[in-house]
């Protein structure tokens, strides 16, 4: 049980951090100012997200809702199953949820404006980072028996390309025109682009390459990607719901290219996850 203390602390921190974000849900305290690019920016003005933009804060709150009511229960259930019978399937499920939680922690650390619970973000990130490294190291040492189907390869390629389709249209015009991002507001960069284009998309192709070589690490990465895409698809729903509640105007092309893409990917990921839920350790 002592070995599980870091994961218990992670769950508690996820609850506290996400709850602090959800309790910031108040659309009545917004204010405006002129940013460094000469554009008028509307600030949220409430709770820990008071210094974040009125466009971004609802996205953060939608993410917090997904974490508290979807990811945390999954984490608890997976941890209990692993405590009762620690086999390859439960370990893969747990490492996948920890990877998703790490993505969340990184987004908070570098994407949210500095606030009074920043130190909790850092502690959460640190616990997840080192716990995930330890778990992935142990899992990658196992020799799993699995068969990669063409549908798995197609899914990984499609997922990797879809992330580029979702985000590159926002970036390319700024490169060509020498301007900042359209919704840069009071931020200096967009962490989602860094994580999705710099890590998640390449991981799709790395996982495919390793699985073709029958390396166990490829299967571990694939399990992480499947769970991550499922969670992101749910997250897109909660984010969009809070954004609509805030009165934010979301352009139809942006809604289609981002929300719909991730929801479709999530449905495919759920189907693949159900088919690939049983893996055996090779003799």
Task: Show where each model-derived region lies.
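Membrane-helix boundary elements
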Residues: 37-54, 162-192
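Extracellular/periplasmic helix-loop-helix junctions in multi-pass membrane proteins
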Residues: 211-224, 231-257
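Alpha-helical transmembrane segments and their immediate juxtamembrane flanks
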Residues: 116-163, 245-283
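Membrane-interface helix-loop-helix junctions at boundaries between adjacent transmembrane segments
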Residues: 78-134
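Alpha-helical transmembrane segments of multi-pass integral membrane proteins
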Residues: 6-20, 103, 121-137, 147-173, ...
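Interfacial/capping segments of alpha-helical transmembrane domains
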Residues: 23-42
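A loop-to-helix transmembrane entry motif
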Residues: 57-65, 180-203
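Alpha-helical transmembrane segments in multipass membrane proteins, preferentially the mid-helix core
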Residues: 75-80, 132-138, 167-168, 198-214, ...
